[in-house]
Amino acid sequence: MTRIHSHLLLALLACWAAPSNADSWLPAEPKIYVSPDQTYRVRIDPRPITSPLAYFSDKVKGREPAGAPKGHKDSKATATIEHLENAGQWIRIWSGNLSNQVAPVDALIADGGKYLVTFDNWHSMGYGQNVVAIYDGHGQLIRALALSDIVSADHIAALQHSVSSIQWRGEPHLTPEGLLVIPIVVPDAQDESKEETYLDAVLRLSDGPVISGSSPDWQRAEATAQFVARQKRDYEEQAKQAFIAPLLGPSENTERNWHGYLNEAFYRSSPDWKDETTSTTVLRDPNAPDYAASEGWLRDALLSLDYEHGTMSFASIAPFDFFVARVKAILADAEPGQLKGSKVHVAAPTSALPLLQTIFAKTGARVFVFDPNIPIPQRPDRLKRYLSRD
């Protein structure tokens, strides 16, 4: 049976082993944007919601306007454009609804108040039919564009996605010639962690078409996006097969791999997997220059932290006998019953369980092993949930 590569396990861990890390968005607040010539401004007021949680709860239940306080029937954000008169007073030109359900993320107003442009939606950058919305000087919508109106489907797939958003652009600006320039993130085929590079998408404000995209630079960017998107699709298919397949220990003896294995083994094996999570600690090779830190983490996990009724999982890059010796030495300082109520999982052969139980006996912890050589099948309910996404 082929071992599952750890980089796939890490992908599974991110998506399934624990709750996903949600984006952190502050509640939408009123914002004011001023034209380049400082004579026009727009105030954008979000639609009131009781809380982000109420908004998303109502969305799931199909209630609209989602998250609205009792008695509020507004369904859209509003914009008010004002002009600075010679006397120094701001005079209202128009006020009306925008296309955004709660609020846009950013906005621009042109000199003379001729155009208002909004970008994205609160808590969902890159999604929706109005990632860009262009309005004329009277508040009439000229055009709303989805991200797919600006870049290809492969380009979108190749961009970085968070739980709520697509990281697709930099800071846009307007030109005196009546154009909107949006720096579009160019996917990198080599290193997603390096600083982002951008390529300008240009839109004509008067009627909203994208007038860029045919240059050699854009053609190269789209070719790169196609390559990255194909890689992601291949990776997702491999991750899917890894999630479905029985789990074995990592084929490469690295710290990152073992963390992934411990997490996935816990969620496949523990009867309490729905209600608990596990900490993971990996003892490094004693010859590694950074070994000492990992022994400190091992000591902290066993003695220093309050793990009452907690769950801990351990693995070792070092030989198993060395790991056992270090654990015995650390637990020599443990008080009787110090880990009572805790569950300890160790990546080790099944035959090592009696030895490990003896070592932990005075602590009161319950000890289990994840045998890397024994395949752990996927839970049917996790598998059903996973496959239901397709």
Please state what every model-predicted region is.
Residues 17-19:
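N-terminal signal peptide c-region/cleavage motif recognized by signal peptidases
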Residues 230-299:
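N-terminal, charge-rich interaction modules
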Residues 54, 62, 66-100, 133-163, ...:
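Aromatic (tryptophan-biased) beta-strands that constitute blades/sheets of beta-rich domains
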Residues 111, 142-152, 284-343:
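Mature extracytoplasmic domains of secretory-pathway proteins
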Residues 37-73, 113-125, 178-187:
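Short beta-strand elements that form the blades of beta-propeller/WD-repeat-like
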Residues 69-77, 124-129, 192-197:
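Short, solvent-exposed loop/turn segments at conserved positions within beta-propeller repeat blades
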Residues 88-113, 118-120:
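Blade-loop segments of beta-propeller domains
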Residues 21-33, 158-243, 373:
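Acidic, small-residue rich beta-repeat scaffolds with periodic aromatic anchors
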